[in-house]
């Protein structure tokens, strides 16, 4: 965590490093890599002390400790108008990508399953040129 420092961290099946961002609210995911669809699925995130802003084509990253199955969480979010997709699951935590830009205090997310939850960043959705 140095000024202007950026970390690029991979999504690995046995690590919920992204859950630690709930305890480090100044650190945010601001990019999901690769950014181009033709390069394959997103497998890493860029993290820094930045304020993320909407771009018009965003995905928001949200964490929950809910013991419910991912499908049940997706259904609960969907009932509240939030489109979600499971990104990773490890250490009792689940990481979801939410279609659109959501603020940390969004009431729809406050109603979502889990006692330890939160937005940990946002990034543009994948695109192709």
Where are these regions (language model features)?
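Domain-level signature for soluble enzymes in the chorismate/prephenate branch of the shikimate pathway
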Residues: 1-129
């Amino acid at each position: 965590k140095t000024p202007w420092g950026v970390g690029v961290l991979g999504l690995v099946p046995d690590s919920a490093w992204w859950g630690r961002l709930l305890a480090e609210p100044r650190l945010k995911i601001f990019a999901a890599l690769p950014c181009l669809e033709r390069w394959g699925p997103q497998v890493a995130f860029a993290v820094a002390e930045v304020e993320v802003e909407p771009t018009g084509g965003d995905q928001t990253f949200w964490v929950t400790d809910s013991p419910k199955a991912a499908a049940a969480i997706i259904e609960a979010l969907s009932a509240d108008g939030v489109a979600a997709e499971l990104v990773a699951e490890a250490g009792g935590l689940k990481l979801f990508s939410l279609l659109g830009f959501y603020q940390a205090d969004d009431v729809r997310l406050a109603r979502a399953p889990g006692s330890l939850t939160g937005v940990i960043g946002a990034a543009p959705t994948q695109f192709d040129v």
